[in-house]
A protein has these predicted regions:
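Amphipathic, non-transmembrane alpha-helical segments in extracytoplasmic/periplasmic proteins
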Residues: 30, 38-39, 89, 102-128, ...
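Acidic, small/polar-enriched beta strand-loop surface segments
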Residues: 182-208
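Juxtamembrane "anchor/assembly" segments of surface/extracellular structural proteins
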Residues: 1-51, 90-94
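Surface-exposed cap/loop segments at beta↔alpha junctions
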Residues: 46, 53-131
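Hydrophobic residues embedded in beta-strands of well-ordered beta-sheets
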Residues: 85, 170-172
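Glycine-centered loop/turn motifs
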Residues: 52-58, 145, 188-190
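Short, charged/polar, Gly/Pro-enriched secondary-structure boundary elements
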Residues: 92-100, 178-187
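Short, conserved phosphate-binding/catalytic loop or strand-edge motifs used
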Residues: 128-140, 175
Length: 208
């Protein structure tokens, strides 16, 4: 089931504001890169499509779990003669790029888990890591996503290494990700409901 939550609704433990029946919904994940959801939904008579707005949250089953949250970043403009609406969304952990600001965070001689705990202290986010090597990094005036694996130095990945998975409000950074994640997840509407299709192209490139 694919659900959508209004941007003001943060009660993700319960059902969303509406159930969606997209023509296509694709979740793609690149190792230590971009995770993105692309969705095409019909302009339906029931008006479900009207819930598809920027900042709304889509809940979909993926290789990470039955209910993974993605924040809509942008939607297509709908004209009167259009038959569908498209949306692009990113993992809800990516919200930390806007609301988790590291003014002066200095994990010193810490293992991966300890460093991430310091970086996320006092926030709604959490982390999991099996990285046992110790390292040091000073993060001053950086947002969490940039400090994790952004373009500026230093980043967590530069200092501690590891491979990243996103699980709602939790980030997992292990030496190597484990499990059968190397697949793109697709959903299409058919006569019986939502069909899941698996593609091995253009996704996580190495999984052990």
């Amino acid at each position: 089931m694919i659900q959508i939550y209004d941007s003001q609704n943060t009660d993700f433990e319960h059902n969303g504001d509406e159930i969606l029946f997209p023509e296509e919904c694709t979740v793609s994940a690149e190792l230590n890169g971009t995770w993105v959801l692309n969705m095409t939904h019909p302009i339906d008579d029931e008006g479900r499509w009207k819930y598809i707005e920027e900042e709304a949250v889509i809940a979909v089953p993926t290789f990470m779990g039955k209910k993974q949250l993605f924040r809509i970043d942008r939607v297509s403009t709908v004209d009167p003669d259009d038959s569908e609406i498209t949306a692009v969304a990113y993992p809800i952990f990516w919200d930390s790029g806007d609301d988790q600001f590291l003014t002066d965070s200095r994990p010193t001689d810490k293992k991966g888990q300890e460093a991430l705990n310091i970086m996320l202290a006092g926030s709604k986010y959490s982390a999991e890591s099996n990285i046992t090597r110790t390292s040091t990094a000073y993060f001053e005036r950086r947002n969490m996503m940039d400090a994790l694996n952004g373009e500026d130095s230093p980043t967590f990945i530069q200092r501690w290494g590891g491979e990243i998975l996103y699980d709602n409000y939790k980030v997992i950074v292990n030496e190597r990700v484990g499990g059968d994640y190397g697949a793109e997840v697709r959903y299409r509407k058919n006569m019986d409901g939502i069909q899941c299709e698996i593609s091995m192209e253009n996704v996580v490139t190495r999984i052990v």
